[in-house]
């Protein structure tokens, strides 16, 4: 009974996602990047499969993936002299869990030889939502340090290139931002914008234009200095919160990466140079790696695909 009750709740949640184009455009972008893989599937699932899932399937899934050897328990904050008691308590709660053999994760091997475009037509969409991106680095790549700074330069703040060009200069949108998604063996760097339906072509040209400018001219020493200072400031503020540390060390341990202190991370950031970032731009900015997803009220427009060129 509880499975059916929760199923109805999730079906309503699924409808909410369908009504939010900003979420939908991310879904179709990932399916475009990673077709025919679990990474490219919707996290919430599909209605048909959700209606078929029963208690036995859920139990089997839990058995396959939830095991002590996959578990990381991270504590941070004012623990002090209580650490021994906490360790004992955690052992009491979780130490007796039976060990079991779990499945290995699937390896994703991307294959793309030309730009791709995915479009969903939503007749009642008041705005067009688009993502333009490129394939990039996996989660543990050393490229992540330099690229994090480049991302700040391109699309994270009011002083970023994309904000100044797309919003301030051209007035094409209220919100534009860039960001990375890095997984075990694949990753991407993406730009999102919400624009008027009749401005999609202009916005696409403007975004591609900024990518072309970055590829041709790279970044400047001044931009790197500002980005580095901004990143350090962000880390200083965030590190005051114990939740930051639970995520910092917890995710690192969970993903099997070498533990890195904040001081170690800052050393990596300080070591990033303009030539290093420009080399990564050359490495990742390739026409055949471009992908675009779009949710708007119109049918698919093939002209947009022709604009995807670096």
List the model feature ranges, each with a label.
Residues 102-161:
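His/Glu-based metal-binding/catalytic segments typifying zinc-dependent metallopeptidases
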Residues 1-102, 109, 119-120, 137-138, ...:
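Charge-rich, well-structured scaffold segments of protease-associated domains
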